[in-house]
A protein has these predicted regions:
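Short, Gly/Pro- and small/polar-rich lid/capping loops
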Residues: 19-52
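Subset of Sec-pathway N-terminal targeting signals
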Residues: 1-25, 133
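Soluble non-transmembrane domains of integral membrane proteins
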Residues: 47-186
Length: 186
């Protein structure tokens, strides 16, 4: 009798855990399906609205395409190499890679992949992606493509945001995802 009660209690516990997991799964699915409404009081609210635009930099060996959404490189093509179809070798494009830099502020956090940057200071070898803040400050992602090289200098520079960042925070998070393509036959 006692053993049957223990077995029943065990089964009841398993069933209760399964029900809780099912409820949590449903709640997560509902939350994921709800539209995200940007915080209109955010210092970067205006930058959270926009449309994607592209800018290209190139030298003799490399062509890079930048997106203002996230202020990132969204396509890289090697000009001196060809793929199996004898086309210029594309290392990655928008479907293959994502990069987001995270910045921890005093009252809010910024994820670069959720923001629309303003493209400024464009030359044949440089571009600045600027994230404008409502207070007149900005966060710049500065890219410089070196001549005849595969090297890209990347600088993050903040201006007028001293009240946004806590003085003790000296780091940023990097979320970089890359899907490597098969480039060789076989």
């Amino acid at each position: 009798q006692e053993e049957m009660a223990r077995a029943q209690h065990y089964q009841d516990s398993i069933q209760a855990v399964a029900q809780k997991q099912e409820q949590m799964q449903k709640a997560q699915e509902i939350a994921a399906s709800l539209p995200v409404v940007p915080d209109s009081t955010s210092l970067f609210f205006q930058a959270s609205q926009g449309s994607e635009e592209f800018t290209t930099l190139e030298n003799d060996v490399l062509q890079l395409t930048f997106s203002n959404k996230g202020g990132r490189v969204c396509k890289a093509m090697l000009k001196e190499y060809n793929d199996q179809q004898q086309q210029p070798l594309v290392l990655f494009d928008g479907k293959d890679a994502s990069l987001s830099l995270g910045f921890e502020g005093k009252n809010e956090n910024i994820l670069s992949n959720q923001m629309y940057f303003q493209t400024t200071n464009v030359t044949d070898s440089t571009v600045t992606m600027r994230l404008n803040a409502a207070n007149g400050g900005h966060l710049d992602f500065i890219y410089k493509l070196l001549p005849n090289s595969y090297v890209v200098d990347f600088t993050v520079q903040a201006s007028g945001l001293q009240n946004f960042f806590s003085p003790s925070v000296k780091t940023m998070s990097v979320d970089w995802k890359q899907r490597a393509r098969q480039m060789e036959k076989g």
